[in-house]
Amino acid sequence: MARCRHHSGYLADDEAAHGTYVARLPKKHLLPEMRPTCKLGRVPHLPSMNRYSERQGHQQNLRRPRAFGGFLDFLTEGQVLDSLQTVVEQATECVATMKTEAGVPLVDVQDRVEVPNSRHRSRGRPSINTVHRHRARPTLCAGHPNNYPSCSSSMSDSHSSVTAGWLGSRSQDSDLGARGVGSLPPMRDKLLLEKNLKRLLRLESKGKVLNQHCSQRDSLLWDSLGSQSSSQPTREQPLSWFSGLLASTSVTPETSELGLGEQEMIFLKQELNKEIKSLLNQPTSFNLPTYCPLREPHRTLDFLSEHHLFPALQRVVSQAVDKLSHACRHNGFPLFPVTSELSPVFPGNSDLQPSSKASLPTDREARGETCYSPTSASSPKTSHRKSKDRRGSPSNAVQMATRFRLKVTPTEVSNVPIPSSQCMLKSPNSDLKLQKQTTASNHNHIPQPRHGLHLTLPAPGITVEVASCQGQLRGQVQHSLATPCHLHSHFPFPVFSPFLPLGKSFSTSPPTLCPEVSSRAGLEVLEGHLKGRGCFTHHF
């Protein structure tokens, strides 16, 4: 037990470990002999190597236990604290001269006894007067047991023990030193906190100066973003003293425990804050006009109309609607089922495309309809009924509308006798077979390749052919042969004369050839040439 006690080098540790005995204290008659050695800076007590003496001292301590205050008295009377103070001053001087890579002192040492209330902080070793005053009046430092070295420890052991005690946690030494009673300097943690506080105050004052001119302009933006005000220190400023040594990285120690996704989000948020700050520091970014909800839509519409962007937007929307209307699900059913297929209207198109406004009749055409129909085939009652049907059912007119195609090619003169119009009027329901045979024989005797004027109507299986001739008329012809052609050129669905039976063929001879016509104007011109003279064939 004695070996462990002397080997540890700390009487306080031995005192705490062995509660049945008290550490052996030197006798009074040894104190006068030890005083000269104390002046030389040597530790007075040496460990005893005699086991008998150790055993005898141990038994003596068991008989007469002494208080721990006797050891403190020994430290005070033997001026052991003086040597401790010297060691601490040397360590303090070494630490005070240490600097970082940036050239900044690592710690700031303050002599609180010399200048207790002054703002000026002295760096380095305390003055000689302070040291002598402390040595002349040594005081007790009540702290942790490890702060007191044993008499058996050497100079290096005492230095290490003092350093270990000085670098420990906060104790009453700093409080006593703050009141000017103790001789030890304040703890390292307190010094570093004070230095960090001074650095933060300096950064805060610098930030106030920099952000003072921007606080009024970006107050609305920062309030909307929910950020902190410019008077408060930013979160990016580190709160630990070693962050200055590590270039003051903005990543806090808590981020190392977070996941990769959270770290990435924090990094992106910091980058966004930097970008916002850089934009706010630019004076040109605040020259933009303020947003007014009552004025901005008007400006947007003006911009679109000035640059003719409405047709482009309409095309884009139409394409999007087209794609969505034809979109299908995984099972093949349409994504948006539509009962009536109505395509968007494109005005300004000369071609009579499906579901276009150009294919719908107008009042002018309805008025011109009576002018071109001299017979009873298109009476006012009939035209009124047709126009009423057109206006009443716009969806049917849209569905029936299609593209007109006309082709004209000359054919050979036929010698078929032409029946009179009176016979046609008297017997409107003549034999259909005879007329079909006559038409077939006429087609068989054409020596040249036959080309015709084809008028494709929206109803399935309906075709109107107009073939040119140079002779007499073929088939049964009425006086109002031009009426069906005129009606076809104006209406998107076929209109026939009540005197013309379905399935009949009729022909006239136009004077000139007309190319393919796809517009309403072309049909009207063609009608003028074919009026009264032409070959029309209507098939179901």
From Swiss-Prot:
Residues 350-359, 372-381 have a biased composition (Polar residues). The modification Phosphoserine is found at S393. It is found in: Cytoplasm, Cytoskeleton, Microtubule organizing center, Centrosome. Residues 79-102 form a coiled coil. Keywords: Coiled coil, Cytoplasm, Cytoskeleton, Phosphoprotein. InterPro entries: DUF4702 (IPR031532). The keyword Cytoplasm applies. This is Coiled-coil domain-containing protein 116. Residues 347-400 are annotated as: Disordered. It comes from the Eukaryota. Pfam families: DUF4702. GO terms for cellular component: centrosome; cytoplasm. PANTHER family: COILED-COIL DOMAIN-CONTAINING PROTEIN 116.
